[in-house]
Regions:
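Short acidic, glycine-rich surface-loop motifs adjacent to enzyme active sites
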Residues: 1-4
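Aromatic-enriched alpha-helical interface/lid elements that frame and gate functional surfaces
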Residues: 140-209
């Protein structure tokens, strides 16, 4: 939270007065100003408040459905990466201006920023992002599937790859089916295609596939 270092004379205002070339990065939960500035920020809280948990986990209504945090402290890690980039940019700017900067970096800012593609999906398609488990909103099939002895991941990024999947699965007719021939069609008919693929993948072991 903000303000903790000022009591020791280690805030940016005090230190930059001694060294105007100082590049100083403050990482807090909610930034240097605003109603939450003096609140502590934890990765778990930020994943919820920033929206990451709204798109992570199984869909509502399924067994195990509901909000789920990512398995690592992702917001903490990404904030560190954002900080390193910002510091390098400030150092480069100092080469031209001779002055340092105070970088105000909030966990919540980063948590929201990493959902930029979800915002783009909404602006483009008008659909509010939802939890989809391991599925992908814009690509089908792109998720986990059962095998005879476990699970595997299929990440089919284009129609050519889908045709090759159909051949490998012994189902060439899928690629000719108008419901599945293009990615746009597969998205529209996801509920019909995914059960068909699951039936086939479950017949062989992961190694066989």
């Amino acid at each position: 939270k903000t303000g903790g270092l000022a009591q020791y004379g280690l805030d940016y205002a005090a230190l930059s007065a001694l060294n105007p070339r100082l590049v100083y990065c403050s990482i807090t939960g909610f930034g240097q100003s605003g109603p939450y500035a003096y609140r502590a920020g934890y990765d778990f809280l930020i994943q919820g408040m920033g929206g990451l948990m709204s798109v992570t986990g199984r869909p509502d209504g399924e067994d195990g459905g509901g909000p789920m945090k990512v398995g690592v402290a992702l917001t903490d890690i990404l904030t560190g990466l954002y900080a390193s980039t910002a510091i390098l940019a400030a150092l480069q700017a100092r080469e031209h201006t001779g002055r340092g900067q105070h970088i105000d970096l909030a966990l919540l800012d980063v948590g929201v920023a990493c959902l930029a593609n979800q915002g783009m999906n909404y602006l483009y398609g008008g659909k509010v992002p939802q939890r989809m488990g391991n599925a992908h909103p814009n690509t089908v099939p792109y998720q986990d599937f059962p095998t005879a002895d476990g699970h595997m991941i299929l990440a089919v990024g284009n129609d050519g790859q889908f045709a090759r999947l159909c051949h490998a699965a012994g189902q060439p007719g899928w690629a000719q089916d108008a419901r599945f021939a293009t990615n746009a069609a597969r998205i529209a008919h996801r509920d019909a295609l995914i059960p068909l693929i699951r039936e086939v993948t479950a017949t062989r072991t992961t190694r066989d596939w």
